[in-house]
Amino acid sequence: LLKHTEKESVDELIKADISELLKLGWTDPEYFKSKAADNKTDVYCAIFKPSHFDENKKYPILDYIYPGPQSLGLRDHSFGQDNGQVLSMVELGFVIVIIEGRGTSERSKSYHDYSYGQLEDNGSIEDHIQVIKNLSETRKYMNISKVGMYGHSGGGYSTANALLKY
């Protein structure tokens, strides 16, 4: 939609048509907020489900982590260039969660500084554990006994840290 600086609509340039995606079973991720491990701080999250999703089945969980520190892992993953891996994994039968734990950017300075000087806490693995436990209580399709984690760059570091620490 093209607009003047006064926000008056001028012309529609193009309109996205996702009808073919919807026919294939694609659904938008579920965005929500949950409490961090401190039980008071809100963290932002998303759940991605396979196109063949069946609420009566149990799905293994993959936690995609990218703690930054300069950017977020959770953006508009619906059609972003980085979401290919997320969409591929859900179609293999996983439920993917993305959790912006304390220490990630683009919130308050104190939120971002949570892991300052303590890189091992970047992205707060404790927040990821808390959110996944909370989710498994309300979303019975999530198999809490089968949880994996993966990420790139800082997310790879956080994944290795989680494997060694937990």
Where are these regions (language model features)?
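Serine-hydrolase catalytic core recognition
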Residues: 1-166
